[in-house]
Regions:
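C-terminal output helix
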Residues: 114-124
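Receiver (REC) domain active-site loop signature in two-component systems and cognate sites
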Residues: 61
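Conserved acidic segment of CheY-like receiver
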Residues: 4-23
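Acidic, metal-coordinating helix/loop segments flanking the phosphotransfer/catalytic sites
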Residues: 34-54, 120
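CheY-like receiver
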Residues: 123-124, 128-138
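As written
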Residues: 101-107
């Protein structure tokens, strides 16, 4: 499996802990780097030297929401060409919200599961898919 970091952007501490626990129980070797604010995540993405494995971001975030963060990444001439896989996970997913998200060229939208089993299923599917996919080398 690719060893690059998984970037988790979510202000819900419990959801972050569940995600990290699920990765550990699934023996996912990737470090999970957590940001509870979109601005901090964006600043990190600008400064990073290695490509993340993927970004999974909550839509409902304080100050800069997930949609705005994705828009900022798309508009950035350094980040856009890196084609970092960007996925949303959210507690809600109206058709309108999902349409807005996909208009920003995301690679997936998941409703946060209420069970550890559900979280593990999403993590397994996402990691297997992106492990097989190639990305631009920057």
């Amino acid at each position: 499996m690719k060893s690059n970091r998984i970037i988790l952007i979510d202000d819900d501490e419990e959801d972050c802990e569940l995600f990290i626990t699920a990765c550990a129980e699934l023996n996912i070797p990737n470090e999970v780097l957590v940001f509870n604010e979109s601005k901090k995540a964006f600043d990190y993405l600008l400064s990073m030297t290695t490509q993340p494995f993927f970004i999974i971001c909550d839509v409902n975030m304080p100050v800069i929401d997930g949609l705005e963060l994705r828009k900022k990444i798309n508009e950035n001439n350094e980040l856009r060409p890196r084609a970092i896989p960007f996925l949303f996970w959210s507690t809600s997913g109206s058709g309108n919200l999902i349409n807005k998200a996909y208009a920003l060229n995301i690679q997936g939208f998941f409703i946060k599961p209420s069970t550890m089993k559900g979280i593990k299923e999403i993590i397994t599917a996402v990691t297997l898919y992106w492990d097989c996919s190639y990305h631009p080398i920057r």
